[in-house]
Amino acid sequence: MLIIPAIDLKDGACVRLRQGRMEDSTVFSDDPVSMAAKWVEGGCRRLHLVDLNGAFEGQPVNGEVVTAIAKRYPNLPIQIGGGIRSLETIEHYVKAGVSYVIIGTKAVKEPEFVAEACRAFPGKVIVGLDAKDGFVATDGWAEVSSVQVIDLAKRFEADGVSAIVYTDIAKDGMMQGCNVPFTAALAAATRIPVIASGGIHNLGDIKALLDAKAPGIIGAITGRAIYEGTLDVAEAQAFCDSYQG
């Protein structure tokens, strides 16, 4: 399982939100590229970038920062989400050196777009499913739909999606542990690999994910915990690598 540091971008800075609320943000760095360097030097094997402004505006806003990080680390897998709602945007990021694009809101509102994106950019598409009480949320988590996460995930199995990033909104940024039972249930219900996100606080939460014995869980995204020092990236990755269960 990969430990994937998150770099959330708002107005060019690296921030963290609580439960997806833009008004409840903490700025951790004015230099996201240097922050990326910190996690790379700490041994991370993938980075998770989010254009928060883009998620709300429906188009990339912090694209220059994303491109700068991708150019600095051409051999590091980078995934980007937030405001990706057109093939042109995906093409821009792929050409910039980004490994994966995360389709969120558009995947819920126009599921057929995911199939189209997978055909145009095979192996590059991840679907981001953000949920509240098992129902998918959209538009920067501002809207909660009537669509159930597992039902939607199954729909994407035939499209060639590389992974699903599952985030429990109630847990995100709260550092109270991630929703392990639902994450494991999602991984068991679909053939698509699952990346857990939201609420990871310490090594105990990483162990809980591993203890779930769900082979479909391939990664865990962590944000506030690594910025506030309750989780060490290198230690957590080493723990995953040596885990025997």
UniProtKB/Swiss-Prot annotation:
Keyword field contains Transit peptide: no
EC number: 5.3.1.16
Keywords for the protein's UniProt record, in alphabetical order: Amino-acid biosynthesis, Cytoplasm, Histidine biosynthesis, Isomerase
Active site: residue positions: D8 (proton acceptor), D130 (proton donor)
Signal sequence coordinates: none
Catalytic activity line of the entry: 1-(5-phospho-beta-D-ribosyl)-5-[(5-phospho-beta-D-ribosylamino)methylideneamino]imidazole-4-carboxamide = 5-[(5-phospho-1-deoxy-D-ribulos-1-ylimino)methylamino]-1-(5-phospho-beta-D-ribosyl)imidazole-4-carboxamide
Superkingdom of the organism of origin: Bacteria
GO molecular function, one term: 1-(5-phosphoribosyl)-5-[(5-phosphoribosylamino)methylideneamino]imidazole-4-carboxamide isomerase activity
Main location: cytoplasm
Biochemical pathway: Amino-acid biosynthesis; L-histidine biosynthesis; L-histidine from 5-phospho-alpha-D-ribose 1-diphosphate: step 4/9
CDD domains: HisA
Pfam families, per the entry: His_biosynth
GO cellular component terms given for this protein: cytoplasm
Subcellular location per the Swiss-Prot or TrEMBL entry: Cytoplasm
Top EC class for this record: isomerase
Keyword Acetylation among UniProt keywords: no
GO biological-process terms attached to the record: L-histidine biosynthetic process; L-tryptophan biosynthetic process
UniProt similarity note: Belongs to the HisA/HisF family.
NCBIfam families for this protein: 1-(5-phosphoribosyl)-5-[(5-phosphoribosylamino)methylideneamino]imidazole-4-carboxamide isomerase
Descriptive protein name: 1-(5-phosphoribosyl)-5-[(5-phosphoribosylamino)methylideneamino] imidazole-4-carboxamide isomerase
